[in-house]
Amino acid sequence: MNLLLDTQALLWWLADDPALTPAARTAIRAAGTPVFVSAATAWEISIKQALGKLEAPDNLEAALAASRFQLLPITVAHALAAGRLPRHHDDPFDRILIAQAQYDQLTVVTHDPQFRLYDVAILWA
């Protein structure tokens, strides 16, 4: 299983927050499991930090580099797939994560019930 962390799951992981489910922790820690973080997640965090709506590591780039997570860029194919998704959910960051997960066959680690409205594999965070 290849994982894609949504923003909340990533923040819970980085903060070692007990809100992250044991199943999600086990899957993220599993040796040999590729874990991806989207460029969209970094973008969302930086925007929300600038607005004072979110606390996250001051140097997210260093925190990600210290992890074994792989960075997932946003491609043209991802962007086009996001635009074609049903309009169940209008959050652009979530829509790109859903498109990336579908396109790259990733399981999204999320605590957002809106993701269940899409044809995407989910591991409940």
Language model features: what each stretch is:
Residues 12-13, 48-49, 85-86, 100:
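A generic structural signal for short
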Residues 57-61, 66-114, 125:
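Active-site neighborhoods of divalent-metal-dependent phosphate/nucleic-acid chemistry enzymes
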